[in-house]
């Protein structure tokens, strides 16, 4: 809150409370899963299904309509846990679908995933190499002017990881 206020002031945002988070009810159904074989048509259809799901969920919510809807799906953490599906944030529709771990030990990484996908809804782009997951230099680094450049102590939210070298994070 104080950090958000300071960042908002630095960017010239004159809102008293630039961010407000309200937790809604548990949805009665799951949002549509990402397609197994993503292509332009399947992604477009999935996006429409997700938007429809979000609209139905908002209609059934007694709270005022949100500017951004974030759906958090929690999974088990630990041995035998399934691979986590990708999380996504849609700027058209202001909807984020996040896959998180339901364990206190994952609170930090869950917060990064939530922030990352919310920023996507606002138009932010990824700052990592899609093939390797490695943060891109310099835009994916938390301290772009640091000397020596690696290892980094901080990360760029849109990079998703903290670079320890040019090839590792």
What are the language-model segments listed below?
Residues 29-35, 80-82, 168:
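Short, solvent-exposed polar/charged micro-motifs at secondary-structure junctions
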Residues 87-92, 96, 100-105, 133-169:
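Metalloprotease/metallohydrolase-associated module, dominated by Zn2+-dependent proteases
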Residues 3-7, 118-121, 125, 164:
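Structured segments of extracytoplasmic/periplasmic soluble domains
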Residues 10, 131-132:
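A generic "cationic amphipathic patch" detector
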Residues 1-59:
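Propeptide-to-catalytic entry region of secreted or membrane-anchored zinc metalloproteases
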């Amino acid at each position: 809150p104080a950090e958000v206020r300071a960042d908002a002031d630095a960017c010239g945002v004159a809102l008293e409370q630039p961010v407000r988070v309200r937790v809604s009810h548990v949805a009665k159904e799951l949002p549509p899963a990402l397609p197994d074989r993503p292509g332009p048509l399947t992604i477009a259809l999935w996006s429409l299904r997700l938007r429809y799901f979000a609209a139905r969920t908002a209609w059934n919510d007694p709270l005022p309509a949100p500017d951004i809807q974030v759906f958090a799906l929690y999974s088990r953490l630990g041995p035998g846990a399934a691979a986590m599906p990708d999380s996504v944030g849609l700027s058209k529709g202001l909807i984020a679908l996040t896959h998180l771990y339901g364990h206190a030990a994952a609170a930090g990484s869950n917060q990064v995933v939530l922030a990352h996908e919310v920023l996507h809804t606002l138009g932010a782009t990824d700052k990592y190499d899609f093939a390797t997951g490695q943060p891109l230099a310099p835009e994916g680094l938390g301290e772009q002017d640091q000397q020596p450049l690696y290892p980094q102590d901080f990360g760029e939210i849109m990079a998703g990881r903290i670079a320890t070298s040019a090839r590792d994070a």
